[in-house]
């Protein structure tokens, strides 16, 4: 059995790669900042063309917005995915396919994807949970507002060949 070091701040608790974050109205278990950045842009299904890629971005973005609305950094990252989907929507059957065996699918069930203003309380709590200062959170969000993901023009493409960001670039994590 592994025994972890004690924590003295509520946000320091880690359970299943999540930390509690107060969003200004309630406490929520929020996925680790680094896990979101490392896992969510990763495509694990075959993407045969640009249309499917845009639908994939829409599905990831909408699931993310359903569970991360009002949260620093993460809300803007998922908004980027939805924005870059160019209006292509993700049908429920495809959403089930791309989110199979993920906790995100369960967490986002019956939740509407939306954006809400990020409160000061959420920024402070996110800092306590993940160590990213509020001014840095805002800088990351501004970067995501102006960032563009790769639009695939080639066909076919498989998950073995995929990168969701522009060639030679990656989604910055802005780690502390």
PLM feature spans:
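Active-site and adjacent loop segments of nucleotide-processing enzymes
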Residues: 8-176
